[in-house]
Amino acid sequence: MGQSIAPIGSVQLLNDIHHLTFITADLGRLITFYQRVFGARVTVDLEEEGLRHAFIEVGPHTVLHPFQVPGLEPPVGQPMFHRGRLDHFALNAASEEAFRELRRRLVAEGANDGRVTDMGSLLNLSFADPDQGRHELVWVKPGVPVAAGLKRAEWKMVDLD
């Protein structure tokens, strides 16, 4: 994290992911959720060719690009790896304090039950968006090697209250 991968000479090839695209049943409801919880900013909201889509900026270099398409519903209630081509995304909290605040907001929205998993190099919580899409919020612990806690057997539930 934070280092470029596979440079050509001294040329960095990528900065980050520009956006993630997925289907929503109700774009207005989804926008409101991300605005309330993450302080998101809508930079594009378009209706064209029988569909509606938006760019929802949830953080620096982090844009969600959901589409509302009539007659097309997102998968609901599917287990991990059965949700389609995009199973989930993980949003990276700016700090431990930000992680705790976002956890509080997600619990208040009913999008998370408050449980947090310590995965060694990061804290992780799962949340559901208004379409029941399962996503994650993580906080990467400074100075902890990324390989720490990679095995599920090493993970533990932690109480942040």
Ranges and model annotations:
Residues 1-13, 16-25, 54-58, 77-161:
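Vicinal oxygen chelate
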Residues 45-46, 77-80, 115-118:
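Short histidine-centered beta-strand/loop micro-motifs
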Residues 6-9, 74-79:
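Short beta-strand/turn micro-motifs at beta-sheet edges
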